[in-house]
Protein backbone atom coordinates (compact mmCIF):
# COMPACT_ATOMS: atom_id res chain seq x y z
CA UNK A 1 0.00 0.00 0.00
CA UNK A 2 1.20 3.49 -0.83
CA UNK A 3 0.15 6.32 1.46
CA UNK A 4 0.31 9.96 0.41
CA UNK A 5 -0.40 13.30 2.00
CA UNK A 6 -2.33 15.79 -0.11
CA UNK A 7 -0.53 18.66 -1.83
CA UNK A 8 -0.13 22.09 -0.24
CA UNK A 9 -3.49 23.74 0.47
CA UNK A 10 -4.26 27.43 0.93
CA UNK A 11 -4.57 26.70 4.64
CA UNK A 12 -1.08 25.12 4.73
CA UNK A 13 0.40 28.11 2.90
CA UNK A 14 -1.20 30.72 5.15
CA UNK A 15 -0.48 28.79 8.35
CA UNK A 16 3.20 28.53 7.35
CA UNK A 17 3.35 32.27 6.56
CA UNK A 18 1.55 33.54 9.66
CA UNK A 19 1.80 30.79 12.27
CA UNK A 20 -1.94 31.19 12.90
CA UNK A 21 -4.98 29.20 11.81
CA UNK A 22 -6.29 31.27 8.86
CA UNK A 23 -9.90 30.19 9.38
CA UNK A 24 -10.37 28.43 6.03
CA UNK A 25 -12.79 25.50 5.83
CA UNK A 26 -12.02 22.75 3.28
CA UNK A 27 -9.40 24.81 1.44
CA UNK A 28 -8.34 24.02 -2.13
CA UNK A 29 -4.80 23.29 -3.21
CA UNK A 30 -2.47 26.16 -4.03
CA UNK A 31 -0.68 26.30 -7.38
CA UNK A 32 2.23 24.59 -5.60
CA UNK A 33 -0.13 21.91 -4.29
CA UNK A 34 -1.54 21.28 -7.76
CA UNK A 35 2.04 21.00 -9.04
CA UNK A 36 2.78 18.46 -6.28
CA UNK A 37 -0.26 16.44 -7.35
CA UNK A 38 0.83 16.44 -10.98
CA UNK A 39 4.43 15.65 -10.00
CA UNK A 40 3.14 12.59 -8.13
CA UNK A 41 1.86 11.21 -11.44
CA UNK A 42 5.47 10.99 -12.68
CA UNK A 43 6.96 9.99 -9.33
CA UNK A 44 4.52 7.09 -9.02
CA UNK A 45 4.83 6.03 -12.67
CA UNK A 46 6.86 2.92 -11.85
CA UNK A 47 4.41 1.80 -9.16
CA UNK A 48 1.49 -0.45 -9.97
CA UNK A 49 -1.67 1.27 -8.73
CA UNK A 50 -5.03 -0.38 -9.35
CA UNK A 51 -7.05 1.31 -6.61
CA UNK A 52 -7.13 4.81 -5.13
CA UNK A 53 -8.83 5.65 -1.84
CA UNK A 54 -9.09 9.31 -0.85
CA UNK A 55 -10.53 11.45 1.88
CA UNK A 56 -13.58 13.55 0.96
CA UNK A 57 -11.76 16.82 1.71
CA UNK A 58 -11.26 18.96 -1.39
CA UNK A 59 -7.45 19.00 -1.03
CA UNK A 60 -7.26 15.19 -1.01
CA UNK A 61 -9.60 14.82 -3.98
CA UNK A 62 -7.66 17.46 -5.94
CA UNK A 63 -4.45 15.55 -5.21
CA UNK A 64 -5.90 12.16 -6.16
CA UNK A 65 -7.60 13.31 -9.37
CA UNK A 66 -4.59 13.68 -11.72
CA UNK A 67 -3.15 10.39 -10.49
CA UNK A 68 -6.47 8.62 -11.07
CA UNK A 69 -6.83 10.18 -14.52
CA UNK A 70 -3.30 9.16 -15.52
CA UNK A 71 -3.94 5.59 -14.36
CA UNK A 72 -7.50 5.25 -15.61
CA UNK A 73 -8.50 4.28 -12.07
CA UNK A 74 -11.51 5.56 -10.15
CA UNK A 75 -11.31 7.21 -6.75
CA UNK A 76 -13.05 5.60 -3.79
CA UNK A 77 -14.02 8.16 -1.18
CA UNK A 78 -13.60 7.00 2.42
CA UNK A 79 -14.41 8.74 5.67
CA UNK A 80 -11.94 6.48 7.46
CA UNK A 81 -8.99 8.28 5.85
CA UNK A 82 -10.24 11.83 6.48
CA UNK A 83 -8.24 14.30 8.54
CA UNK A 84 -8.63 14.52 12.29
CA UNK A 85 -10.81 17.44 13.37
CA UNK A 86 -8.47 19.98 14.96
CA UNK A 87 -8.35 23.18 12.83
CA UNK A 88 -10.58 25.27 10.57
CA UNK A 89 -9.39 23.35 7.49
CA UNK A 90 -10.89 20.19 8.99
CA UNK A 91 -14.41 21.48 8.49
CA UNK A 92 -15.42 19.88 5.21
CA UNK A 93 -17.73 20.86 2.40
CA UNK A 94 -21.27 19.46 2.36
CA UNK A 95 -21.67 16.29 0.33
CA UNK A 96 -23.93 18.06 -2.18
CA UNK A 97 -21.15 20.56 -2.90
CA UNK A 98 -18.37 18.02 -3.43
CA UNK A 99 -20.72 15.87 -5.52
CA UNK A 100 -21.08 18.84 -7.90
CA UNK A 101 -17.29 19.21 -8.15
CA UNK A 102 -16.65 15.46 -8.61
CA UNK A 103 -19.83 14.16 -10.29
CA UNK A 104 -18.17 10.89 -11.35
CA UNK A 105 -17.35 9.84 -7.78
CA UNK A 106 -19.66 7.89 -5.49
CA UNK A 107 -20.58 9.82 -2.34
CA UNK A 108 -23.77 7.83 -1.64
CA UNK A 109 -22.35 6.36 1.59
CA UNK A 110 -21.44 9.78 3.01
CA UNK A 111 -23.89 11.98 4.95
CA UNK A 112 -24.43 15.61 3.91
CA UNK A 113 -22.42 16.83 6.93
CA UNK A 114 -19.70 14.19 7.29
CA UNK A 115 -16.94 15.77 9.36
CA UNK A 116 -17.03 15.58 13.17
CA UNK A 117 -18.51 18.43 15.17
CA UNK A 118 -15.91 18.08 17.93
CA UNK A 119 -12.14 17.88 17.77
CA UNK A 120 -10.76 14.33 17.75
CA UNK A 121 -8.33 13.06 20.32
CA UNK A 122 -5.14 11.24 19.36
CA UNK A 123 -6.56 7.90 20.62
CA UNK A 124 -9.70 8.43 18.49
CA UNK A 125 -7.61 9.06 15.37
CA UNK A 126 -5.44 6.03 16.09
CA UNK A 127 -8.55 3.86 16.54
CA UNK A 128 -9.89 5.02 13.17
CA UNK A 129 -6.49 4.35 11.57
CA UNK A 130 -6.43 0.88 13.12
CA UNK A 131 -9.93 0.20 11.77
CA UNK A 132 -8.78 1.22 8.29
CA UNK A 133 -5.58 -0.82 8.61
CA UNK A 134 -7.56 -3.92 9.62
CA UNK A 135 -9.90 -3.47 6.67
CA UNK A 136 -6.99 -3.11 4.24
CA UNK A 137 -5.20 -6.14 5.68
CA UNK A 138 -7.96 -8.29 4.17
CA UNK A 139 -7.99 -6.51 0.80
CA UNK A 140 -6.44 -8.60 -1.97
CA UNK A 141 -5.35 -5.46 -3.85
CA UNK A 142 -3.80 -3.71 -0.84
CA UNK A 143 -0.30 -3.85 -2.34
CA UNK A 144 -1.50 -1.85 -5.35
CA UNK A 145 -3.66 0.66 -3.46
CA UNK A 146 -2.84 4.36 -3.12
CA UNK A 147 -4.30 6.20 -0.13
CA UNK A 148 -4.52 10.01 -0.42
CA UNK A 149 -5.01 11.42 3.04
CA UNK A 150 -3.80 13.95 5.61
CA UNK A 151 -1.05 14.65 8.12
CA UNK A 152 -3.03 13.70 11.25
CA UNK A 153 -4.50 10.50 9.83
CA UNK A 154 -1.19 9.36 8.35
CA UNK A 155 0.54 10.07 11.66
CA UNK A 156 -2.07 7.89 13.38
CA UNK A 157 -1.65 5.16 10.77
CA UNK A 158 2.15 5.11 10.48
CA UNK A 159 3.50 7.01 13.48
CA UNK A 160 5.36 9.23 11.00
CA UNK A 161 4.95 12.81 9.81
CA UNK A 162 4.43 13.51 6.08
CA UNK A 163 5.12 16.70 4.13
CA UNK A 164 2.60 18.01 1.60
CA UNK A 165 2.66 15.84 -1.51
CA UNK A 166 4.91 13.22 0.08
CA UNK A 167 4.22 9.52 -0.44
CA UNK A 168 5.69 6.34 1.01
CA UNK A 169 5.29 2.63 0.51
CA UNK A 170 3.76 1.25 3.70
CA UNK A 171 5.35 -1.84 5.14
CA UNK A 172 3.45 -5.06 4.44
CA UNK A 173 0.24 -5.38 6.43
Task: Give the residues covered by each predicted segment.
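Short glycine/proline- and acidic residue-enriched helix-loop micro-motifs
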Residues: 23, 104-123
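Active-site-proximal alpha-helix that buttresses catalytic centers in soluble enzyme cores
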Residues: 2-77, 99-101, 122, 165-168
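Active-site-adjacent alpha-helix immediately C-terminal to a catalytic or transition-state-stabilizing loop
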Residues: 69-72, 130-173
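Short, well-ordered beta-to-alpha junction loops that form the rim of enzyme active sites
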Residues: 54-58, 80-81, 148-152
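Short catalytic/ligand-binding loop motif for oxyanion handling, primarily in non-cytosolic enzymes
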Residues: 10-13, 60-63, 84-87, 116, ...
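Short, surface-exposed amphipathic charged segments that create phosphate/polyanion-binding patches used
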Residues: 89-97
